[in-house]
Amino acid sequence: MNEFTLNAEQRSDLGKGASRRLRRLASLVPAVVYGGDKAPESISMLAKEVAKLLENDAAYSHIIELNVGGKKQNVIIKALQRHPAKGHVMHADFVRVIAGQKLTAIVPIHFLNEEAPVKKGGEISHTTTELEVTCLPKDLPEFIEVDLGSLEVGDNVHLSELKAPKGVEFVALAHGTDLAIANVHAPRIVKDEEEGEAEEGAAE
């Protein structure tokens, strides 16, 4: 049984006004399912079920079993529209997953051994926190690991240095873009401290 499941119902009342009514009156999240050889479907889901599903970060990059009126299909999250202030999901886009057919998905990065460069006096900047990948459904990773343990102050990590899991391709590299993933830099001196030292020097 799929660890990630979501129930939904088809909706025929479309448009921005209808979507607002769904959210306000029925606590529902409007969504669209597309891809494969089927026509796009407009659906709605209980907001509380969507929120519960997304409590697990793995859901963002995992195949979800979507039950629409009793008919099950496998999908992945393509995009989420959130409320700018409250953060809850206002609309969702799902893409159907077809066995044997490659898919494109966004996968989070998990950084390992971050304490090592920090102990050497460095500060870590995460330039990229998720990656777009292409693979077959069976090869879809929940995350990509990046080990920072060997980095020194001044070092950085680029996408080309990462080893993609078997069967997985990084979309950016395929398009000739070598993304910066993370870097280790010397701690920035707080401006107030610099001013304080300057004042002390002037007083002397």
From Swiss-Prot:
One of its GO terms (molecular function) is structural constituent of ribosome. Belongs to the bacterial ribosomal protein bL25 family. CTC subfamily. The keyword Isomerase does not apply. It comes from the Bacteria. Disulfide bonds: none annotated. This is one of the proteins that binds to the 5S RNA in the ribosome where it forms part of the central protuberance. Keywords: Ribonucleoprotein, Ribosomal protein, RNA-binding, rRNA-binding. InterPro entries: Rbsml_bL25/Gln-tRNA_synth_N, Ribosomal_bL25/Gln-tRNA_synth, Ribosomal_bL25_b-dom, Ribosomal_bL25_C, Ribosomal_bL25_long, Ribosomal_L25_dom, Ribosomal_uL5_bac-type. SUPFAM superfamilies: Ribosomal protein L25-like. The keyword Ribosomal protein applies. PANTHER family: RIBOSOMAL PROTEIN L25/GLN-TRNA SYNTHETASE, ANTI-CODON-BINDING DOMAIN-CONTAINING PROTEIN (PTHR33284), RIBOSOMAL PROTEIN L25_GLN-TRNA SYNTHETASE, ANTI-CODON-BINDING DOMAIN-CONTAINING PROTEIN (PTHR33284:SF1). This is Large ribosomal subunit protein bL25. Pfam families: Ribosomal_L25p, Ribosomal_TL5_C. Part of the 50S ribosomal subunit; part of the 5S rRNA/L5/L18/L25 subcomplex. Contacts the 5S rRNA. Binds to the 5S rRNA independently of L5 and L18.
